[in-house]
Amino acid sequence: MTEKLFYKDSHLSKFDAEVLSCVRAKRQQVKDSFGRLDGKAGEYYEIELDRTAFFPEGGGQYADTGVLYMADDDTCGLDETARKKVQVLDVRERNGRIFHITDGFIEAKTAVKGSIDWEERFMKMQQHTGEHIVSGLIHAAYGYNNVGFHLGSEDCTMDFDGEITEEELRRIEAEANKAVWKNLKVFT
């Protein structure tokens, strides 16, 4: 089973790992809810690592993206930008195992350095925390439960089991902003 570093440190953006397996991805495995990876079968690979900080798609949230660098390729001492790398385009979890959908092959037992697209991850963290704040305020004020949540690259939506008026929504927004301005510690 893959060690899930994102549960230990949600701010971790770089990590070391070893490739456990790398196989060609099946066509249905390389399409996400946005249709991002709609290429032909065989163009993408599923890489399983012994540990990862890449958060997989789930819970209404799309997967992290980023890069896997070959750790043993120092390319004459140059930085990561000059190293051999593959793009991590999607991440899926199946039966406790996490698979990174990439645009290139990496041999099993290869040491890699993972680098998460931090700007994207941080944006998702903020939106996810905001969803919890808004949902909690709506539940406390009106008793409605959050029955659906979607965090996408362009928007964030929440579904509740009751109607919320424009006036009520403005009040909730003001209360949510107050909570953010207080800069309270977030526990995960």
How does the language model describe each region?
Residues 1-188:
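A glycine- and charged-residue-rich anion-binding loop/surface
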